[in-house]
Amino acid sequence: MDKVATAAYVYGVVQGVGFRYSTQRQAAQLELSGYARNCDDGSVEVVASGEPHAVEMLIEWLKQGGPRSARVDKVLIEPHGKTDYKGFTIRY
């Protein structure tokens, strides 16, 4: 099956609560590649690449609130063109 890549922009209380690291662990369990990074507007950008079902599962996890320490108010999703990431990293 072909890989897909999706960018998710997660808004709410998502910085300073371990959100990127929890997302990295969840992505690794789903065998996804990509990255998570804090944005200047207080959101977190998550780019995930891999099997379509696994990407959907990560997006659903994000929408359900991610880690317990976070509060997710909304998640905006858009397609992302690049699929050839090596592992899932935290970007600064």
Curated annotation (Swiss-Prot):
Disulfide bond sites: none
Active site positions: 20, 38
Listed Gene3D superfamilies: 3.30.70.100
Catalytic reaction annotation: an acyl phosphate + H2O = a carboxylate + phosphate + H(+)
Keywords carried by this UniProt record: Hydrolase
Broad EC category: hydrolase
GO molecular function, one term: acylphosphatase activity
Top-rank lineage group of the source organism: Bacteria
Keyword Hydrolase included in the entry's annotation: yes
PANTHER family associated with the record: ACYLPHOSPHATASE
Protein name: Acylphosphatase
